Amino acid sequence: MWFNPRMSKNFRVVALIGKYQSPEVAEAVLRIAEFLRVRGLDVWIEQGTASSIGMAGQFAVASYEEIGAQADLAVVLGGDGTMLNTARRLSQHGVPLVGINQGRLGFLTDISRDEALPKLGEILEGRYTEESRAMLDAEVLRAGHRVFQTLALNDVVINKGDLGRMIEFDLSIDGEFVYTQRSDGMILATPTGSTAYALSANGPILHPNVGGIALVPLCPHALTARPVTLPDTSHIEIVLLPQHDARIHFDGQARFDARAGDRLRVTRSPDVVRLLHPQGYSYFAMLREKLHWSATPRRP
């Protein structure tokens, strides 16, 4: 295979991060690792990935902290869930991410497994488009003390707890009371998360370049409670009212069990996720494909 020795000059250390316990990902990780090694790159396998797919000893193994500190590029193999987890762990380090789709929809992992090697080759040669995705910084306060904090790339969701009944909460924005809502919960979504859970709850699609946070009620008791898009400079606070418990989910991966009186505070994080796409990537083409826009109804 032809190789340009000037390629990859900006990517010397490449980390591979794969979905755990997936035979298909194991094969893809090995194939891509060999592809990168032939090009003279230092290949690191994230330690959980290496352990899960049995590659320890074949390549250098590194923790997320080591990848964040020293890797020039991280290639994520899996679905959007794997990318969300990786993004939260590496965003503070500024490591650019490339997504190889081994899952289903793949809004974030936009390179198909069949095109992985040629598309990676293009990116290593510098032929790519880079974009930054906003994240949310969320914290929970109890009796004035912070008891939980994390980041989210997609969304923060507060919803009903074990009893399965509606919850009631106060919503304030920038210190101003907005309303008291009774509902199954609320989704706070980034532009990236606007095509996830928020979309299925009739929320708006926000272009990634829009500086906004979507508030999408879940089955509100008042039918006039509609989705609202706020500037991403907003400070959002939700206070869970008495006699209600709730669960708060972050990107559908981390969870916190909230009690009455707990305060959920959400702002835009100063950290961003750097995504690299092959040349020719189009956000609207991606939506058209994933959401089946322009599809012609067919008779059975």
From Swiss-Prot:
Keywords: ATP-binding, Cytoplasm, Kinase, NAD, NADP, Nucleotide-binding, Transferase. One of its GO terms (biological process) is NAD metabolic process. The active site is at 80 (proton acceptor). One of its GO terms (molecular function) is NAD binding. Its cofactor is a divalent metal cation. It catalyses: NAD(+) + ATP = ADP + NADP(+) + H(+). It comes from the Bacteria. Pfam families: NAD_kinase (PF01513), NAD_kinase_C (PF20143). SUPFAM superfamilies: NAD kinase/diacylglycerol kinase-like. It is found in: Cytoplasm. Its main location: cytoplasm. NAD(+) binds at residues 80-81, 154-155, 165, 182, 184, 195-200, 253. The keyword NAD applies. NCBIfam families: PRK01231.1 (NF002306), PRK02155.1 (NF002561). Belongs to the NAD kinase family. This is NAD kinase. It comes from Aromatoleum aromaticum (strain DSM 19018 / LMG 30748 / EbN1) (Azoarcus sp. (strain EbN1)). The gene is nadK.
